[in-house]
A protein has these predicted regions:
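Transmembrane helix boundary and interhelical junction motifs in multipass membrane proteins
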Residues: 162-172
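Conserved PDZ fold ligand-binding element
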Residues: 3-26, 92
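Alpha-helical transmembrane segments of multi-pass membrane proteins
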Residues: 151-160, 200-208
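PDZ-domain C-terminal substructure recognizer with occasional recognition of PDZ-binding tails
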Residues: 9, 15-16, 27-72
Length: 226
């Protein structure tokens, strides 16, 4: 792979990829996933206290499911109490970046409506996570479900801050307009805009649900009753 050709070796610590800071291994995985169209990727890494840069070329060999750079994560370490808080914050940041990158891919057409998930998709994902984690025990189930919860929370937070009517981001736009104009926007007009935005969001939710598999819910209900 390209990493070995460019001189990277075991023990090197990647600190940046494509200009983004790397705090956890998932940061690298996310960049590769959401920037798979890039032919070259610049990375910054540390070795023996010195900073180096290299330009890597993603390559997909036989048996690979996606183009790879040739780097892997190191061994897991116990960072202590405060370190756990720090890396917990990095994990939340990762899920926020994941949400923002997903929106970017949606806007640019790299993903379509079939890739969106609504309530049905969320239930399906949670059930899938539970089924995979169940053999490993209760602690793994709780940890994986917490990760799903963080993802959903990050999605809701980012979406709510978008400058769209009916969302907090839309309300913020009106506050900025009022600050520039020096007077308040008519409450009736603002209410109409937010109502129209809410209606469009409901339509979008229905469209997304039609692209999912409602039969999944019926199957779950049958399994539960059995």
């Amino acid at each position: 792979y390209s990493a070995q050709e460019q001189g990277l070796s075991e023990g090197d610590v990647i600190t940046k990829i494509g200009g983004r800071s790397v705090h956890i291994w998932n940061d690298i995985s996310l960049y590769n996933l959401t920037h798979s169209e890039e032919k070259e990727v610049e990375i910054t890494y540390k070795r023996d206290g010195k900073t180096h840069t290299a330009v890597l070329e993603p390559r997909q060999k036989e048996g690979d499911t996606a183009p790879l750079l040739g780097v892997t994560g190191g061994k897991m370490e116990r960072p202590g109490f405060f370190g756990t808080l720090k890396y917990g914050a990095y994990t939340v940041k990762y899920w926020i970046d994941y949400t923002v990158d997903s929106l970017r891919m949606l806007v640019t057409g790299r993903v379509g409506m079939k890739d969106l998930s609504g309530p049905v998709g969320i239930v399906s994902a949670v059930d899938g996570v539970y089924q995979e984690a169940a053999p490993a025990g209760l602690s793994v189930i709780i940890l994986n479900l917490m990760n799903i919860g963080i993802l959903i929370t990050a999605n809701l937070g980012v979406m709510n801050l978008l400058p769209l009517p009916a969302l907090d981001g839309g309300r913020l736009v009106f506050l900025i307009i009022e600050a520039i104009r020096g007077k308040r926007v008519s409450p009736d007009k603002e209410g109409m805009v937010h109502f129209a935005g809410f209606a469009l969001l409901m339509v979008l939710m229905v469209v997304v649900m039609f692209h999912e598999k409602p039969v999944y819910i019926i199957e779950m209900m049958i399994d539960f009753m059995e």
